UniProtKB/Swiss-Prot annotation:
It comes from the Viruses. It is found in: Virion; Host nucleus. GO terms for cellular component: host cell nucleus; virion component. InterPro entries: Lentiviral_Vpr-like. The keyword Transcription does not apply. This is Probable Vpr-like protein. Seems to function as a Vpr-like protein, since it mediates host cell cycle arrest in G2 phase. Cell cycle arrest creates a favorable environment for maximizing viral expression and production. Keywords: Cell cycle, Host nucleus, Virion.
């Protein structure tokens, strides 16, 4: 099952990498609601491989910079709400 970037609680003490986690989560949250369906499906498929997570975030950041005024297309960018490529072979238990 793929793991999307998620927000993790930070503390009062600045830790190395905390800002990167927040940046990744905020980027994914913003972009996954606005990108075209084909691109979202491609990124969700890439997130099944943990080695491609940085590439997905980098592509999402580039897309976000190029499409600053993009309208919201969907409420959520998760696999459950956006079944697509490879979804049929996955069993999701909540």
């Amino acid at each position: 099952m793929e793991e999307v970037p998620r927000r993790q609680p930070g503390g009062l003490v600045e830790a190395e990498g905390v800002f990167q986690v927040y940046e990744d989560w905020e980027c994914w949250d913003y972009v996954s609601q606005r990108v075209p369906d084909e691109r979202l499906q491609r990124w969700l498929a890439m997130l099944t491989n943990n080695q491609l997570r940085r590439q997905v975030i980098r592509e999402a950041q580039i897309w976000m910079w190029k499409h600053k005024g993009a309208a919201v297309r969907r409420n959520c960018g998760c696999r459950l709400c956006n079944p697509g490529w490879g979804s049929q072979v996955r069993n999701v238990e909540l």
